[in-house]
A protein has these predicted regions:
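Short, charged/polar, low-complexity loop and linker segments
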Residues: 36-39, 62-75, 109-117
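Short, solvent-exposed, charged loop/turn and helix-capping segments
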Residues: 63-85, 99-105, 140
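Amphipathic, heptad-repeat alpha-helices with coiled-coil/zipper character that mediate oligomerization
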Residues: 26, 51-59, 82-103
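A charged, solvent-exposed segment within the mature domains of Sec-exported extracytoplasmic proteins
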Residues: 105-154
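Sec-dependent bacterial lipoprotein signal peptides
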Residues: 1-9
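Short, charged, amphipathic alpha-helical segments
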Residues: 50-57, 80-85, 112-124
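A structural signal for well-ordered alpha-helices, especially hydrophobic packing surfaces
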Residues: 34, 38-41, 60, 64-67, ...
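Immediate post-signal-peptide N-terminus of mature secreted/exported proteins
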Residues: 9-54, 146-154
Length: 154
């Protein structure tokens, strides 16, 4: 009976690791891609910024759909909730702030005023995303510790 319990616990930890890794890897791609997105926006070239915006927005939306489609882990929703919070922040910023700005750019190259707006939007995005990153990192560490994932990592 003790052996069955130990095997069952070890199996739960392996499933927890797989669940965590799936969320972590999905969200990490979005986080890492934000740097390329920022570079494209701050190239001050309309076509490059729009192309990057469409690609990044699609990535955020598909990742959000993937996370929303996942079930909780045995009643624990912490990691899922905070990953969705981060992704919704990106989605709302892209849809409600950056996209309207990009649609308003008239020329191929940003005007001096548009350059200032682009810089301001990126500063705001960067400053705001830190709080969401911190909350997501907290949730990931909490899940890692509570589910004893270290016991199945090598």
């Amino acid at each position: 009976l003790l052996i069955i319990c130990l095997v069952g616990c070890h199996f739960k930890e392996k499933r927890a690791k797989q669940y965590r890794d799936t969320i972590l890897q999905s969200v990490q791609v979005v986080i890492d891609s934000s740097l390329d997105y920022g570079d494209a926006l701050q190239s001050y070239e309309r076509a490059r910024a729009l192309q990057s915006h469409q690609k990044y927005s699609a990535l955020v939306n598909s990742t959000l759909t993937k996370i929303e489609g996942m079930k909780d882990f045995e009643g624990d929703t912490t990691l899922q909730v905070f990953s969705k919070e981060l992704l919704v922040f990106y989605k709302n910023t892209l849809d409600n702030e950056i996209n309207p700005f990009l649609q308003s750019v008239k020329g191929e190259a940003f005007s001096p005023e548009e350059t200032l707006v682009a810089d301001s939007l990126m500063i705001k995005l960067t400053m705001s995303e830190n709080q969401y990153w911190e909350r997501f990192n907290w949730a990931e560490k909490k899940f890692y510790k509570e589910e004893k994932i270290a016991t199945v990592e090598k």
